[in-house]
Every structure is written in structure tokens, then in C-alpha cells.
Amino acid sequence: EAVVVGWHRTFDFDRLDRASAAVRAGARFVATNMDATYPAPDGLLPGNGSLVAAVATAAGRQPEVAGKPEPPTVALVRARFGERGVVAGDRPSTDGALAEALGWPFALVVSSATLSGDEPSDHDAAFVGPSLAALADKVIGALVGS
């Protein structure tokens, strides 16, 4: 038996109750990511990390984290894509950390998540732009040129 917490808008007290009871009873507890917020057109929403925190608090146990930048994800990406690539994303704390763990450049897509000021900037971006489309030529040029 396992409880896997992934972000969704329908998380409610009944789900929290069932999930935390299962974890307290010994179910494996897995989080897909620990993002505190989720970017939306009208601003930031509570992210999966907020949902995970509720279950962890109620269950008295921390989860295994399966998403970026955790070692299982690093191994999966490396096995699937090899030694060269670029990680693109809007969160230096997860996407930038994944890029660093892989030894790949980080392409930062500016979003409400990065503009909020809540994101740490421990991971320098090799490329920065307002969208993936805006970064495509720079990123492709860097990959082809290296």
C-alpha cells in the first residue's frame, strides 16, 4: 500500500484524513515534488509541497520525494537522455538543482514562480527568457556548438 501525493485542486479534509491514516498505518509515503507554490495566470497557488506538509504533519512522517532534483529523477533522466542536455524550467530550486546534479546547463523560463521572489537563486541559469520558444535558438545553438 502507498500514498502518493501529487498536486491537484480537489485535495480536501477527507483525502487528508485517509492519506494520513494510511501513512500512520505503515503505507509507503511518496511525494511527487515539494514545490511550495504552483504558478497560475493570476498568481501563485499552494503547491504540492503544501499538500505534502499537511499529510506529513497529520501522519507524523516525512515522505520519500520522487521528483526533481532527487537522485531517482537524476538517474532516470541520465538513463533516458545520456550525458548531454539542458534542463529548462521556472524554478531554480528544483529545475536549476536538477541541471546542477546532471552537470547540464539550466535554461530559466521566467514565470510568476520566479517573479514572486520566493525562489532561491542558488543555481545560476546559462539562459534566461520569457518562454521556452524565446530560449529555443539559444539552447539549440549551445547544444549543437558544444
Model regions: which residues?
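Asp-based, Mg2+/Mn2+-dependent phosphohydrolase catalytic module
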Residues: 1-146
